[in-house]
Amino acid sequence: MAEKSTKNETALLVAQSAKSALQDFNHTYSKSWTFGDKWDNSNTMFETFVNKFLFPKINETLLIDIALGNRFNWLAKEQDFIGQYSEEYVIMDTVPINMDLSKNEELMLKRNYPRMATKLYGSGIVKKQKFTLNNNDTRFNFQTLADATNYALGVYKKKISDINVLEEKEMRAMLVDYSLNQLSESNVRKATSKEDLASKVFEAILNLQNNSAKYNEVHRASGGAIGQYTTVSKLKDIVILTTDSLKSYLLDTKIANTFQVAGIDFTDHVISFDDLGGVFKVTKDIVVSSDESVNFLRAYGDYQTHKGDTIPVGSVFTYDVSKLSEFKDSVEEIKPKSDLYAFILDINSIKYKRYTKGMLKQPFYNGEFDEVTHWIHYYSFKAISPFFNKILITDQDVTPRTE
């Protein structure tokens, strides 16, 4: 497991970048600073420092790697180019030659060839966030350079935090959705109480360490072309997704002792949340037809939605859209029906790749409002491989989809 990042690391990274940017600016210009004497702050020393030195310097770092909200961040692999489909899919599955490749690739694959080696989640498009700095704020509301710099950095870090929270919600929903819909019936075990669940979690951890073909979904991959595939998981690779209340209970059981004896911090191997819901999946194609829906989606960062757009089945929203007129009875919350829920899996089954280098784009100035708008572009890929062990323990009835 990766080491946890801290707020101190965040502060140190930002401070080092700000110091380096200031040194570069002073070397290029001078050490004598002014906020300018114009009515606006465009092309002044401070505006030049923030947009030409400070933000580009921070853009060279992987600030998104710091713990600003995403508990799955340590799983992410930074890649300069991310293919839409994972290596396992490319190697182990064959796309039929008569498929209509003019459709959206991911949706086309889901509908025409659903039993693929690696289930795909997320649209795989470039996601966008924006933030605006008002020049009058930086010019008139701060007495020192440090105050204004902290203001600019604070807005930027807030957007990075928003990205991480969004990524975390998508990853959590992917795991919950997979556990409730893709596991074999033999890998779903019933529990009747916290005590019973803890006992079955302990048994499952022992089971996953045996070389067996029972605990993966290989028979559902590749269109059923592979009959069985033996897998074994090391204790250090086993993690548990559950609720905060169950985590607090599991920490006081023999399961925690087992990890401790092996020299492993059990707290790092239980990923928990106060609520496993909050993400909504579209169950049928939806046509956006009202200004209310457009305004609502844009308020949550979806700047590209217009009236008449079709939101395809399977699309995921990390906020509640169920009350919008077009979405009523057409979305479902991705959430276990019971609080008795523990998903035990090999961490290698999670495929999480992203491209965030240079994600802060060149800003543009709006003279009407004396504002500078910055856009952040980032790309991520999330998938779950059936070629690793998984067991779900819950008290609800779970029926795998037969698609």
Curated annotation (Swiss-Prot):
It is found in: Virion. Keywords: Capsid protein, Virion. GO terms for cellular component: viral capsid. Its main location: virion. Assembles to form an icosahedral capsid. This is Major capsid protein. The lineage of its organism: Viruses, Duplodnaviria, Heunggongvirae, Uroviricota, Caudoviricetes.
